[in-house]
From Swiss-Prot:
Major hemoglobin is a heterotetramer of two alpha-1 chains and two beta-1 chains. InterPro entries: Globin, Globin-like_sf, Globin/Proto, Hemoglobin_a-typ, Hemoglobin_oxygen_transport, Hemoglobin_pi. Heme b binds at residue 88. This is Hemoglobin subunit alpha-1. Red blood cells. One of its GO terms (molecular function) is iron ion binding.
Amino acid sequence: MKLSADDKHNVKAIWEHVKGHEEAIGAEALCRMFTSLPTTRTYFPTKDIKEGSSFLHSHGKKVMGALSNAVAHIDDIDGALSKLSDKHAEELMVDPANFPKLAHNILVVLGIHLKPHLTYSVHSSVDKFLATVGYVLASKYR
């Protein structure tokens, strides 16, 4: 999915409000996904995935850090996430069907905490951005 100039502007604008809150947003999005979609827990059988756990916070920070990197390189998301795509496909072997599930929960959390900034057009742009990231991460699966 190609991001328009408006999409890129909208994503960069809302990400200014995400900065400094990546860990909390990521942890909440993961917790919501694991709670509402229990099958997504299978990749973390030995981890404490309860609300507020240190694992959720550290992994949430990683997830949102990768998204922040994609925002910073929004004109070359493929290049920015190439190594992460390799890792997910070859090492972690996460089912790419889970990427849209996490994207949905990230949008939910952004809607809760950044409601005034998540206008209809920004929501649409962030949705397209997250779909693009999911596509890039899944691109190296075979």
